[in-house]
Amino acid sequence: MAHEFTWDHVENPDKAIVFTGPGSNASGFVDALDSISDTMDYIRIDDTQYEILLKDHNKGTALTYVADHLNISTDDCYAFGDSNNDISMFKAAGHGIAMGNACDELKEIAEYVTDSVNDDGIYHAFKYYHLI
């Protein structure tokens, strides 16, 4: 049974992950997201998963905040990711490293593509960048 989505029960959200059923028609859901686009952003992870977060609050702004707090340049930051919700972080970091199992969209903008997590990808990237 399909349910109509409303924001009536949501108070002051910071972030949400929403899953839709396989083969479901998410167009109504996307329309609801578009209706709050002045305060919230959303990232379509895949056909059944959306990440919803406060406008201009994402992994990229988080990386910038932490780097500023630690008084280091984002040029000296290494970001590892595997999904399109990591794109903002890759754009903020000096070095964006896509895991071997990453989505194609992320691999296209990555500075380097390493092995998957299961194949010690982070270790191999550290070796590649002479960090260890």
Regions inferred by a protein language model and the residue ranges of each:
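Conserved acidic, metal-coordinating active-site core of Asp-based
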Residues: M1-F80, N84-M89
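Acidic, Mg2+-coordinating phosphoryl-transfer loop and its flanking beta/alpha structural elements
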Residues: L63, S73-A110, D115-V117
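Generic C-terminal helix-cap and adjacent flexible tail
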Residues: K127-I132
